[in-house]
Amino acid sequence: MKVAIYPGSFDPITNGHLDIIERASKMCDHLIVSVIHNPNKNPLFSLEERKLLIEECIGKYANVTVDCFSGLLMEYAKGKEATAIIKGLRAISDFEYELQMALMNQRLCPSIETVFLMTSTEYSFLSSSLIKEVAKFGGSIHGMVPANVYKAITNRF
């Protein structure tokens, strides 16, 4: 069985993330959306809240599950017997950072490939940080995030 991991902070998940999930789910037998716990960040939503928000969005994908982790991605991936890491790219600036990470990950675990997926054009401007900033100042994020996330963010701000 081909297992792929789509890691991220997903604080919050956006329609761009869901675009990558939908497309990546067609490329593997099992896709694990892995919510990263980063102790150096101060997230809007807790790890468990982010996991639940994502689970509410992925019900139509029988081969997609959600998990949480902290630590080295490649150690986590080996434990899940993954063969690929999925990374979404919006722009060249994403590629520069993600290429460096992919090369390090390849060095740590040569048997696991990194697969880059370009975000669909209509989502290429979206980022979780931008969503939070717009919402914080009262701007509309309608159509940029799933309905459950829209409700959670508007309740938070």
Curated annotation (Swiss-Prot):
Pathway: Cofactor biosynthesis; coenzyme A biosynthesis; CoA from (R)-pantothenate: step 4/5
Main location: cytoplasm
Keyword Transferase part of the UniProt annotation: yes
GO BP field: coenzyme A biosynthetic process
Record has Flavoprotein as a keyword: no
CDD domains: PPAT (cd02163)
Residues of the site described as Transition state stabilizer: H17
Reactions performed catalytically: (R)-4'-phosphopantetheine + ATP + H(+) = 3'-dephospho-CoA + diphosphate
Enzyme class of the recorded protein, top EC level: transferase
Positions that bind ATP: S9, F10, H17, G88, L89, R90, E98, Y123, S124, F125, L126, S127, S128, S129
Pfam families: CTP_transf_like (PF01467)
InterPro entries assigned: Cyt_trans-like (IPR004821), PPAT (IPR001980), Rossmann-like_a/b/a_fold (IPR014729)
EC number: 2.7.7.3
Record's subcellular location: Cytoplasm
GO MF annotation terms: ATP binding; pantetheine-phosphate adenylyltransferase activity
A single cellular component GO annotation: cytoplasm
Residue positions binding substrate: S9, K41, L73, K87
Free-text function comment from the UniProt entry: Reversibly transfers an adenylyl group from ATP to 4'-phosphopantetheine, yielding dephospho-CoA (dPCoA) and pyrophosphate.
HAMAP family listed in its UniProt record: PPAT_bact (MF_00151)
Family to which this protein belongs: Belongs to the bacterial CoaD family.
The protein's assembly and partners: Homohexamer.
Record-given protein name: Phosphopantetheine adenylyltransferase
Native organism: Alkaliphilus oremlandii (strain OhILAs)
